[in-house]
Amino acid sequence: MEVHVVSSTVIPQSLPPTETTKIPLTVFDMVIPNIHMAVLYAFMPPTPTNTALKHGLMKALKLFPTLAGHLSGNNDRRRPSVSVGGNGGGVLMVETNIALELLDILPLEPSPKLLQLHPQTDIAQHLLQIQFNRFSCGGLVIGITNHHRVADGKSMSSFFVTWAKLVRGLHIDKFPVYDRTMLIPRDPPRCDHDHWGIDFQPFPLPPSSLPSPLKSNKVCNVVVHYSVDFISKIKAQMPRKHSTFEILAAHLWKKVTRARGLDLDTLTEMSVAVNGRSRLRPAVPSEYFGNMVLNTIPRAHVKEVTEGSVADVARLVHDAVGRIGDGYIRSLIDFWEINSGDELVSVADVEGPVLCPNLEIDSWLGFPSHEVDFGAEGSLCGFLPSWVPVEGLVILKPNVVGKGGVDAVVALFEDHARLFKQISHSLD
């Protein structure tokens, strides 16, 4: 696939340079890895013009100004912020042509080739980067990267939906919330939970905390589809009610661990991303723009995971998720305040590219991908990460091509991936 770049421009911030506002990053922004995230949306023709998309984008950025801002003090682990207005910032917009029909590359599955469909993340100069990839048939793939410390997946989903509505000329009735007063520490602050080694590490890092180099084994991305019928069969095995996420997380933990062939007495962990908005008291509005995701970590020995029932493993996941409540969130806010004079490093930044014997599972199931409709009657035919390079990372996403159910993107070494595909749908 040859991607021909037609133009590359920067959409400036909507505020004049004389008006500058600094929005401090919260502890929830800083516990997130310091990286750009990438996602692809693919649409069958007919699709709106790039000009229409750009005009809608400029309107959306007035509502989501931090996406066009710039990080100030990004190297200061104490109190960085997003500067809106002033010099710098803006959004990178790239336009490309591809001399293929979109059908020629469908169905889209994560691959290093798809990295061409969005701006590079490792040398990003802007918090938000967007690439419009036009195919010969009129099909469109929009590749987006955003700095994770400015917004989580829930926030970016709200941005995509708003942008799409503005392109279609629709009324916007939900606006982003930037109020940080909901996240202030208690007086006096106190830590009721241990956050060292779980959320943050002190700086400088001890040598034992540094990431290990990537092994020579090639990491590949496996996409497996779990139909509504298959999910119902797993739920039928449950003596108590569990969410779709919990049962699929348990099922995948079992299958990935078995595919890796680990010793039965090895301890394995699964990092689970939890949206904290509704878990704080009072709850943070769902429109809150920024990060409000925390990780919780169920642990067990390989024997318990591989030989235990799906119900047993789902209970481990359920109990770990349940530990993320108002008390834990308030404790983390206070931890950040108590250690305000120290340099802290997110544990997520020192994990490295190989998670084995552990894994991480992120859910995109609650993202309203079906509402990302830019009009012109073009139907959504792809919603996915471009490529997952981290061994042991799993992403659950809704299937958007009419099958329903859930797609799981699983990044594993090749030899483990082959076995995983063979056992991915076994119910034992």
Per-range role (PLM):
Residues I23-P24, F28:
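Detector for long, low-complexity, acidic/polar
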